[in-house]
Amino acid sequence: MAGPVRCLPPVVEATSIPHAPPVISKEVSEIVNNMLSVAIPAAAAASAQDQRFASQFRCGPEFTTMKAQALEACRKILAENDQGGYTIPAKGLYPYQWNWDSALVSLGLAEMEEERAWEELDRLMSAQWEDGMVPHIVFHKPSSTYFPGPEIWGSPDKPRNTTGITQPPVAAISVRRLLEEAKDKALALAMARKLFPKLLAWHRWFYRARDPEGTGLVATIHPWETGMDNSPAWDEALARVPIDDIPPYVRRDLGHVDAKMRPQKAEYDRYLTLLYRFRALDYDEAKLYYETPFRVTDLCTNCILHKANEDLLWLAGATGACTDESEIRGWTARANVAFDTLFDVEAGLYRCKDQLTGQFLPAATSAGFLPLFAGVASGEKASAVARTLGRWLDDVAYGIPSCDPRDPQFEALRYWRGPVWLIVNWMVSEGLKRYGYGELAQRVERDSYELVKNGGIFEYYCPLTGMGAGGGCFSWTAAMCLAWLFKT
């Protein structure tokens, strides 16, 4: 298909917001656009009932054609975003290695080349600090397209050229899956044994630095640590952070993506206020915990950590790398009890908490479904969560929105305030199947398929129109297609 280089479908909704196209090769652009040119007429020909609720959507000829084209596009996207041992999320917008992005991307890379998938994880863990923390960004190469860079973070030699905060610890989850599905068992076992001590040290850091009181749930001290940066869950807690007299700055993200899809200035001012305060404390873990004006119990971080602990325990047995499993079992036992304190009976959903007030944070977000992924919900609570999810899906054209669509803070295109993210859909789908809600999981998978088919390979998607938004030719979306959506 002729046309400009893009990852957008050739026809978009009238409500779409134009933004700068991603910098991609002509080859990738043509593959993506060919994929979309086949998909859109096929989607139009199908009934809405067939599109969204067919229980065997992976069995038809349309899916077979779409699968071949999508997999080719996704492989090429990951190849183009490969910087030689690590993968960037998207060119320009995110030019470095992000923590949970790389862990999730490794799942897609494993469908292409196992050795490269292990290299992704190994490169990430090589940035681990002396205290066990794994930073949320590793600045491997200089770049002028992102702010704040390494000169702002000023991280000490632990090593240098990283940020001073972390992200949800997906890595152990990825290591287990790579080992379980490995074709090269010798390589996989050797790499799992190499990475196990680093994973264990990271998890120990979480409980030492972020749960010094032994509650069973860890704290996050910056919205960027949650991975869900501008979630409405943080509005109330973040608003109490006084904006310091921070140096003037220029946001680079707005040169790549429309401002209506990104966090607002008042949020960025507070993000940077926290950053400069943490730097002034020399990233001392005790001072950060007790002196930060923002400290929350984030469901995403805690659910992923719990699932990662479950997988770390499995890895201990599979690799023989840990002879005493009692420490890990203690973490999971305490968390299993503590998660009950995050369930909101009236909402039928789990909620994040403000650790400085002890109160629930008011916004209902997609993180509230992740206790199913972690396996910490009772049957009764899981049933309530499934009912709530069904209502959310009924309220939008495509799920899962990152915020309750009935919430006044819902914004369909603004980052984590409404858009659909395939990584969340994958985790929730896995959780639903874990609890026996296969039909609801199939519905989430079907919506995810429709989004990719009609919207391209984007960072996230509008839940009302299906339009791709944020960064284009996005690595973890491509990885989810390879490792989940089109993996049959």
Curated annotation (Swiss-Prot):
Protein's job: Catalyzes the hydrolysis of alpha-D-mannosyl-glycerate (MG) to D-glycerate and D-mannose. Can also hydrolyze alpha-D-glucopyranosyl-glycerate (GG)with lower efficiency.
Catalytic activity: (2R)-2-O-(alpha-D-mannosyl)-glycerate + H2O = D-mannose + (R)-glycerate; (2R)-2-O-(alpha-D-glucopyranosyl)-glycerate + H2O = (R)-glycerate + D-glucose
InterPro entries recorded: 6-hairpin_glycosidase_sf (IPR008928), 6hp_glycosidase-like_sf (IPR012341), Glycoside_hydrolase_63 (IPR004888), MGH1-like_GH (IPR054491)
UniProt family annotation: Belongs to the glycosyl hydrolase 63 family.
GO BP: mannosylglycerate metabolic process; oligosaccharide metabolic process; protein N-linked glycosylation
Taxonomic lineage from the root: Eukaryota, Viridiplantae, Streptophyta, Embryophyta, Tracheophyta
EC identifiers of the protein: 3.2.1.170
Protein name: Mannosylglycerate hydrolase MGH1
Catalytic residues identified in the record: 229, 459
Residues binding substrate: 94, 98-101, 146, 167, 227, 262, 415-416
Pfam families listed in its UniProt record: MGH1-like_GH (PF22422)
